[in-house]
């Protein structure tokens, strides 16, 4: 049995979209950790941050993520900040093949400019928030087994690149 595949990277980079496509092609189950959390708590991630705080969210995220990684035959889309958690990161690196989806901030900003569902984008100037978050996370994201530069690639090409690396390693 092959290892699970995890996708990490900034919010809005396309982890869920790419993950769904990969899971379909590889006949694996797709799991979006944020969606599981929302379903279990019956609140959006945004509302969880507002009502219960980031610390509560991160602890819940850790439990859900570790639980999902232990299951078999999964393509797992991690929350944007999940890889910052040492337990999640180390467990993912030991038990999955991990891919960092990387997209330049200008393109990321275009994707997120009208989003109301991103709890860490609090300023009117999304670019400043993104730069700050990216600076805090990029070194940690780089621990992933593979870095996939998504800048000029269509989703289908990103999917093919990841599947090729996943199957040939």
Predicted regions: what they are:
Residues 2, 21, 25, 71, ...:
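NTP-dependent small-molecule kinase module
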Residues 7:
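Hydrophobic anchor at the beta1->P-loop junction of P-loop NTPases
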Residues 80-83, 104-106, 153:
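Short glycine-rich anion-binding loops that position phosphate/pyrophosphate groups of nucleotides
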Residues 33-93, 118-119, 127, 131, ...:
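ATP-dependent small-molecule kinase phosphotransfer cores
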Residues 10:
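P-loop (Walker A) phosphate-binding loop of NTP-binding proteins
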Residues 13:
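ATP-binding Walker
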Residues 92-115, 148:
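Conserved phosphate-donor/acceptor-positioning beta-strand/loop module used by diverse small-molecule
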Residues 16:
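Walker A/P-loop
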């Amino acid at each position: 049995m092959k290892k699970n595949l995890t996708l990490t990277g900034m919010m809005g980079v396309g982890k869920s979209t790419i993950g769904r496509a990969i899971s379909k092609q590889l006949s694996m189950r797709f799991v979006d950790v944020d969606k599981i959390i929302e379903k279990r708590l019956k609140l959006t991630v945004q509302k969880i941050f507002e009502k219960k705080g980031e610390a509560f969210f991160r602890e819940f995220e850790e439990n859900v993520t570790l639980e999902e990684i232990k299951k078999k035959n999964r393509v797992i889309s991690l929350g944007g900040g999940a890889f910052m958690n040492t337990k999640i990161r180390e467990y993912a690196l030991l038990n999955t093949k991990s891919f960092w989806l990387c997209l330049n901030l200008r393109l990321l900003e275009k994707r997120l400019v009208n989003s109301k569902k991103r709890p860490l984008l609090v300023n009117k100037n999304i670019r400043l928030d993104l730069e700050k978050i990216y600076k805090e996370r990029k070194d940690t994201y780089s621990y992933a087994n593979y870095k996939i530069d998504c800048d000029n690639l269509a989703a289908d090409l990103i999917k093919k690149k990841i599947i090729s690396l996943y199957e040939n390693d």
